[in-house]
Amino acid sequence: MPKKFTYAEAGVDRKIRAESKKALALLKRTYKFSRYGRVVKLPYGNIFPFSRYLYLDLVIEGVGTKVLVAQLANKYDTIGIDGIALAVNDLIRSGAKPLAVADNIHAQVSDPALVKAWMKGVVEGATEAE
């Protein structure tokens, strides 16, 4: 049986993370800033009033420890596919439809081959989601 890999072994301290997330409560002060109404808090995120009868569900997806798996397999397109799949899954829970993908990549190294594989995965994931 393979060895279990934990968040702690990947360098993630879940207690500190939970403590840090408490600071997000400060954002509630901004929930009334829209002229169209208040931000609606859902169990997994928030939706934002975009016009009188429309809401925007904004998803920011991180790849987290998936990078470790991609490095071990030397296969990076799966990061893009998975990122899109997770973002779309978050969107459809509120009844939203995907609108766009931001092209913001946070990577330790700017390796053109890695970025190309990653973007191929993003395109494949978006195509599958369509």
Explain the meaning of each model-derived region.
Residues 26-130:
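Glycine-rich phosphate/pyrophosphate-binding loop regions near the starts of catalytic domains
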Residues 2-36:
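N-terminal amphipathic/basic leader segments beginning at the initiator methionine
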